[in-house]
Swiss-Prot record:
PROSITE patterns: LIM_DOMAIN_1 (PS00478), LIM_DOMAIN_2 (PS50023), PET (PS51303)
LIM zinc-binding domain residues: 82-147, 148-207
Region (Disordered): 253-344
GO annotation, biological process: actin cytoskeleton organization; heart development; muscle structure development
Name of the featured protein: Prickle-like protein 4
One Pfam match: LIM
A GO term for molecular function: zinc ion binding
Length: 344
């Protein structure tokens, strides 16, 4: 690695020089790594009073416990022997090493190695967040502690949210791509990978010649985000042991080819009929059954039904006993009340 001058490792903030072309790439990287909506309520949409208070507390805690800025120092002969924490190679005299106070005085990195543990991007302006011995950019450090809504790119501070497709969404942000109606607590299909309500799904595939291939069906359900999730990213989603995989088969009775589940799920982890999976505290326990054959298996349902209900019923509604065609989805949904999975 060739020595780099201190100007290259400047810790100054990004600025737009009117005499030069703006550094849009650097600005975009800065906004990606340090989302303003994670830091200041002025950049957030539709925050309630409680959410605003939670955001302020969240920002203050991160600033106090994790935020830092690296310092670039020339490696002097007396400092020879320092090993880069990432590549494990020695820093040579005349090179610049980056030191992070929160990591300890003896730990240092090559400047290109001073990067986010999650995304691998070099930390712009050497701004870092320190968590469990690792460096993170602001975006991915925040996601260790709070779920991020894929629709609006804001962290979720409300107690209620919608869980679907292995992610958490603001309660009304998981919507049908056609009619924009919220799907929280209701069934949906995934034609082409985008959520679609049963009514729009039927309209789209009302033509008998249309293909169902690649269209899956699932059920979004409501849960709670919890207040403190400092144990790591694996707590931001439902435990994979409580979730079986996917749903609707392709037309013509062919077996399901595409299966969806949470990262890390496997056939060995799936619940068998009759098994009771223990859900993590503060998280909703829900299961989506894999449909192997349209003739043998009903639609998927949420597994958190009360044990006191009669067999064949779920939350007061009779479970479907036979394969439903697209034409019957709308009729069934128009008669059945909207079901929400709520936390006890």
């Amino acid at each position: 690695m060739s020595p780099q001058g201190p100007a290259v490792l400047s810790l100054g903030s990004l600025c737009l020089d009117t005499n030069q072309a703006p550094n849009w790439t650097g600005l975009q990287t800065l906004l990606q790594q340090l989302p303003p909506q994670d830091i200041d309520e002025r950049y957030c949409l539709a925050l309630g009073e409680e959410e605003r208070a939670e955001l302020q507390l969240f920002c203050a805690r991160r600033k106090q416990e994790a935020l830092g800025q690296g310092v670039a120092r020339l490696v002097l002969p007396k400092l020879e022997g320092h090993t880069c924490e990432k590549c494990r190679e020695l820093l040579k005299p005349g090179e610049y090493g980056v030191f992070a106070a929160r990591a300890g005085e003896q730990r240092c990195w090559h400047q290109p190695c001073f990067a986010c543990q999650a995304c691998g991007q070099a930390l712009i302006n050497l701004i870092y967040f320190y968590h469990d011995g690792q460096l993170y950019c602001g975006r991915h450090h925040a996601e260790l502690l709070r779920p991020r809504c894929p629709a609006c790119d804001q962290l979720i501070f409300s107690w209620r949210c919608t869980e679907a497709e292995g992610q958490r969404w603001h309660e009304n942000h998981f919507c049908c791509q056609d009619c924009a109606g919220p799907l929280g607590g209701g069934r949906y299909a995934l034609p082409g990978g985008s959520p679609c309500c049963p009514s729009c799904f039927e309209n789209r595939y009302s033509d008998a010649g249309s293909s169902w291939a690649g269209a899956l069906e699932g059920q979004a359900f409501l849960g709670e985000t919890g207040l403190d999730r400092t144990e790591g990213r694996d707590q931001t989603s439902v435990n994979s042991a409580t979730l079986s995989r996917t749903l609707l088969a392709a037309a013509g009775g062919s077996s399901l080819q595409t299966q969806r589940g949470l990262p890390g799920s496997s056939p060995q982890q799936e619940n068998r009929p009759g098994d009771k999976a223990e859900a993590p505290k503060g998280q909703e326990q829900c299961r989506l059954e894999t449909i192997r054959d349209p003739k043998d298996t009903p639609f998927s349902t949420c597994s958190s039904s009360s044990d006191s209900e009669p067999e064949g019923f779920f939350l007061g509604e009779r479970l479907p006993q036979s394969w439903k065609t697209p034409g019957s989805l709308q009729a069934e949904d128009s008669n059945a009340s909207k079901t929400h999975c709520t936390m006890c």
